[in-house]
């Protein structure tokens, strides 16, 4: 095998091993996150709402406001807005 082929093989192996290590770290982190959600649930917190809050916190403020406005429009169109909001 030529040096170029050996070098390419070594590079490929290095990439694969790095990806495998990162995948293992990702699994460990996912397990840790799952444990935190379990802990929060055991203390009475709603994990669906926690996930929603985390999702909202990741959004840009303008993006969040735009999505809220679209959601409000859809809810109004379907008659799902509470009476207090309709009067406002």
From Swiss-Prot:
<dbReference type="GO" id="GO:0003677">
    <property type="term" value="F:DNA binding"/>
</dbReference>
<protein>
    <recommendedName>
        <fullName>UPF0335 protein NGR_c28390</fullName>
    </recommendedName>
</protein>
<comment type="similarity">
    <text>Belongs to the UPF0335 family.</text>
</comment>
<dbReference type="Pfam" id="PF10073">
    <property type="entry name" value="GapR_DNA-bd"/>
</dbReference>
<dbReference type="InterPro" id="IPR018753">
    <property type="entry name" value="GapR-like"/>
</dbReference>
<dbReference type="InterPro" id="IPR046367">
    <property type="entry name" value="GapR-like_DNA-bd"/>
</dbReference>
